[in-house]
């Protein structure tokens, strides 16, 4: 098993009024040149957790951080106008908390939990990645406060 030191939460950047099936997600990732879905888990709007990549395999979800991380993506992240928003359903929130808890229990080491946006470069060098430095807004909520 790989050494894991980070869990990275993502959104699928899907509008709140549109569905993105696991098959759709796989098609998108294959078109980007991946061998399949880059995330290890995908959480549908109804809270269903789909294991989309074996944990033993390196993900393709956070460039420069894939080797020692697990990627979790929730369906959503855009409001009906297509703007970044926390569109997680109560079922997704519960499923995400439970999944992260299970992963922390399994790996038992010092695992950082963060959003994809938190991996943006610290452009002003003050030691904090602030909203104006985010390369993207994904996952559209404050992971450190929600989990």
Kindly give the residue locations of the regions a language model identified.
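Short, conserved "active-site rim" segments that organize catalytic pockets and cofactor/ligand binding
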Residues: 1-57, 66
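Ligand-binding face of N-terminal immunoglobulin V-set domains in extracellular IgSF glycoproteins
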Residues: 72
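Basic/polar, cationic surfaces and motifs that engage anionic cell-wall
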Residues: 1-8, 12, 45-49, 65-68, ...
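Short beta-strand/turn micro-motifs at beta-sheet edges
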Residues: 59-61
């Amino acid at each position: 098993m790989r050494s894991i030191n980070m869990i990275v939460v993502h959104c699928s950047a899907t509008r709140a009024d549109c569905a993105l099936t696991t098959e759709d997600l796989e098609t998108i990732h294959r078109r980007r040149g991946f061998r399949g879905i880059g995330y290890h888990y995908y959480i549908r709007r109804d809270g269903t957790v789909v294991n989309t990549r074996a944990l033993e395999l390196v993900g393709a979800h956070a460039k420069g951080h894939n080797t020692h991380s697990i990627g979790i993506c929730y369906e959503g992240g855009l409001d009906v106008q297509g703007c970044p928003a926390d569109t997680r359903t109560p079922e997704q929130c519960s499923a995400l908390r439970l999944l992260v808890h299970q992963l922390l229990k399994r790996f038992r080491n010092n695992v950082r939990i963060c959003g994809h946006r938190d991996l943006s470069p610290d452009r002003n060098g003050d030691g904090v990645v602030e909203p104006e430095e985010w390369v993207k807004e994904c996952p559209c909520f404050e992971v450190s406060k929600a989990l």
